[in-house]
């Protein structure tokens, strides 16, 4: 009897496994959305021994993309081409205007990063047609074609974390009361004072914090000069600075080491809703509408989505990190400070199967890798699955959806606990009616 039961269970398991594998094998890639951090840049501020005049790259000045950054982005573009043009033949070999849309924040370094990536993704080659893709002109680089990069307007400040948000300012005051933040602040002030003394800064040395970003950028281009001019500087001090400031970057995007409730307010939930929530929901909603168009093209109400295959956003480290926080996978970042490196990217692939069921994959890459890492199974809500159900992605998005909308929420004070409860009730109502 026991042998018969075991046999039945084995046959059932194999049948389920075969059905699952068939379902996986029949998955069809329908849409790709990706966001990346710009490439290597110059420092945002001058700091001895390197001043603004030393930063001559990318047209010159502070915060500009460097040749290293251009190369990093070109490499990322080459990886995109290998995956989506050559291996999967998902995108056309030549630039097709209706297939891809590239967007950028309104800064030189992100715009040129997008251009550099596109040079790697759609490089000059025999596949481009003279007189069609580029001019029939002897002075024109053969095979080279321009690809547009669309720049954010002020109305897109929410996804770029550029809006003036009163609620977020109140949250910063609240999280300052947490022991985790207090301890990090003590360590930061101690380091600021120590480094300020090295630079002979006597005015408010506890607030001297320019060195963390400056060192990270200077060491890529002026490392020998730093060691020659700063006898106290070394790698241990550099790493200490990056690790000391790492918690404050995390706090800003809603990542706290412990449950963090202040006056009944869930600080991580509130911060992530304001910081990562707008972009996460924009990505989810665009993907959902695309899948709907795939399933029912005749009733697709958004015409541009029908042929669109690749949507990209050239942005910044904090935006990439904010998304990783909402997805629960910040551990995929392996840098010293746990912060997305230059040219790191998060990519979301949307799939359908013959039964019109949709699912997603999440891919992460930093600039030390030659390919993307599939991190889908690491996302808690995906439960270790190879493909994450679209409904699970929806649950994540709605958990961090600013309600009733971002600007209204920003103007809603934390002083009313009911505002927090109402936000959670709205999330429940939306999930109930839309799942």
UniProtKB/Swiss-Prot annotation:
Reaction catalyzed: a phosphate monoester + H2O = an alcohol + phosphate
Catalytic class of the enzyme: hydrolase
Record's keyword terms, sorted: Disulfide bond, Hydrolase
EC number: 3.1.3.2
Gene3D superfamilies reported for this sequence: Phosphoglycerate mutase-like
Family statement drawn from the similarity comment of this UniProt entry: Belongs to the histidine acid phosphatase family.
Name assigned to this protein: Putative acid phosphatase F26C11.1
Source organism per UniProt: Caenorhabditis elegans
């Amino acid at each position: 009897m026991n042998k018969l039961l075991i046999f039945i269970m084995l046959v059932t398991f194999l049948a389920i496994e075969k059905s699952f594998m068939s379902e996986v094998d029949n998955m069809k890639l329908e849409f790709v959305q990706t966001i990346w951090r710009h490439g290597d840049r110059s420092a945002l501020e001058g700091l001895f021994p390197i001043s603004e005049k030393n930063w001559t790259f990318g047209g010159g000045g502070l915060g500009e993309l460097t040749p290293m950054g251009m190369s990093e982005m070109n490499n990322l573009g080459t990886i995109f081409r290998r995956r989506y043009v050559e291996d999967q033949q998902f995108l056309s070999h030549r630039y097709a205007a209706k297939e891809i849309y590239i967007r950028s924040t309104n800064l030189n370094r992100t715009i040129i990063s997008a251009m550099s990536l596109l040079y790697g993704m759609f490089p000059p080659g025999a596949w481009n047609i003279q007189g069609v893709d580029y001019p029939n002109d002897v002075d024109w680089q053969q095979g080279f074609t321009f690809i547009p990069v669309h720049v954010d307007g002020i109305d897109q400040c929410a996804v770029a974390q550029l809006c003036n948000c009163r609620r977020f300012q109140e949250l910063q005051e609240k999280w300052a009361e947490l022991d985790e933040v207090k301890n990090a602040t003590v360590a930061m002030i101690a380091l600021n004072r120590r480094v300020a003394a090295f630079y002979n800064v006597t005015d408010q040395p506890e607030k001297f914090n320019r060195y963390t970003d400056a060192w990270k950028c200077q060491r890529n281009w002026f490392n020998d000069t730093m060691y020659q001019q700063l006898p106290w500087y070394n790698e241990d001090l550099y790493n200490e600075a990056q690790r000391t400031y790492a918690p404050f970057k995390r706090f800003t995007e809603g990542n706290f080491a412990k449950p963090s409730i202040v006056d009944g307010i869930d600080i991580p939930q509130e911060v992530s809703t304001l910081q990562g929530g707008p972009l996460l929901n924009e990505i989810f909603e665009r993907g959902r509408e695309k899948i709907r168009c795939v399933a029912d093209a005749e009733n697709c109400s958004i015409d541009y989505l029908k042929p669109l295959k690749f949507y990209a956003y050239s942005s910044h480290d904090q935006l990439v990190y904010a998304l990783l926080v909402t997805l629960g996978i910040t551990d995929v970042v392996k840098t010293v400070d746990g912060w997305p490196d230059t040219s790191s990217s998060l990519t979301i692939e949307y799939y359908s199967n013959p039964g019109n069921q949709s699912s997603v994959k999440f891919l992460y890459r930093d600039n030390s890798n030659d390919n993307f890492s599939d991190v889908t199974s690491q996302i808690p809500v995906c439960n270790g699955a190879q493909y994450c159900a679209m409904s699970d992605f929806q649950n994540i998005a709605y958990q961090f959806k600013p309600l009733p909308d971002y600007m209204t929420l920003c103007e809603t004070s934390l002083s009313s606990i009911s505002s927090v409860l109402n936000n959670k009730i709205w999330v429940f109502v939306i999930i109930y009616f839309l799942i």
